[in-house]
């Protein structure tokens, strides 16, 4: 049985269930009034759909959602899913490709990630903030185009296109931010 949490005790990062939906608190505010109970408003993310809404939860008692986060490594991809393996137990799980629309751009063999599960349902994948990934193709640098840190387009091995400095070449490894999808630096 999951524990009960009062709406006024919710903080950023807490998870709870409401009407069969699983929410993650992004922001919360508590406005105290003189004559009545305080008003609790939370900006929440539905972990199943990814939608972000603002909910008024004044006076509610909510069931806390215990989200399990398991560290796993990417093994392979088939047509509809990505397969990850727990390096300690060797358990393999399939994550539906539709849950990884953005993340798939940064997942290569042995990429480590935190798989989020609620009971037996997979909710998503948290990648590290930065990953080392290989450039599949980079345009040649244009001679004389060195004004103001000129950038060129490069395609990662996953097919994702990023902008990189002129000195980056095909088959080089670079560090890319998974937060904004931008080039960070060369990898050593």
Curated annotation (Swiss-Prot):
InterPro entries: Elong-fact-P_C, NA-bd_OB-fold, Rib_uL2_dom2, Transl_elong_fac_P/YeiP, Transl_elong_KOW-like, Transl_elong_P/YeiP_cen, Transl_elongation_fac_P, Translation_prot_SH3-like_sf
Alphabetized GO MF terms: translation elongation factor activity
Subcellular location: Cytoplasm
Transmembrane portions of the chain: none
One GO-annotated biological process of the protein: peptide biosynthetic process
Pathway connected to this protein: Protein biosynthesis; polypeptide chain elongation
CDD domains hit by this protein: S1_EF-P_repeat_1 (cd04470)
GO cellular component: cytoplasm
Function statement: Involved in peptide bond synthesis. Stimulates efficient translation and peptide-bond synthesis on native or reconstituted 70S ribosomes in vitro. Probably functions indirectly by altering the affinity of the ribosome for aminoacyl-tRNA, thus increasing their reactivity as acceptors for peptidyl transferase.
Membership in a protein family: Belongs to the elongation factor P family.
Name the UniProt record assigns to this protein: Elongation factor P
This protein's encoding gene: efp
